[in-house]
Regions:
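Phosphate-binding site recognition
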Residues: 1-122
């Protein structure tokens, strides 16, 4: 799942190594720093929680049956996982149950979410 024109980073090796010893790895940082692009280097499948066409469905599923979002080829990338914080416990449970390294990569922005902005007109 390598993006076109990806520029290799030191973090690629760090993430690859972490996935050999840990069931799940969290990658966090400010928006647009390359968390998702770096994580895609290792991911075999991905869920984009911010996908405008699927976000509402994903968030409802995270509430009803979070394990369903964890199904897929591993390592499974859960992008912007902080949108559904209940996934944290679901990932921990799945990692404990599976007992295998390299199951999940969780990316999340440390930049606060920006709410709806009003133009001030009207």
């Amino acid at each position: 799942m390598v993006p076109a024109r990806y520029m290799a980073r030191i973090a690629d090796g760090v993430l690859a190594e972490a996935l050999t010893t840990s069931g799940a790895v969290q990658v966090k940082g400010p928006k647009w720093c390359g968390k998702t692009a770096t994580s895609l280097q290792q991911a075999a499948s991905v869920v984009y929680l911010q996908d405008p066409d699927r976000s509402a469905s994903y968030l409802a599923l995270a509430d009803a049956k979070p394990s369903a979002l964890l199904e897929g080829r591993t390592p499974r990338l859960i992008d912007e996982w902080q949108m559904a914080p209940q996934l944290w416990d679901a990932v921990r449970f799945a990692v404990d149950l599976r007992g295998e390294p390299g199951q999940f990569v969780l990316t999340g922005s440390s930049t606060p979410a920006v709410g709806g902005a009003h133009s001030g007109v009207g």
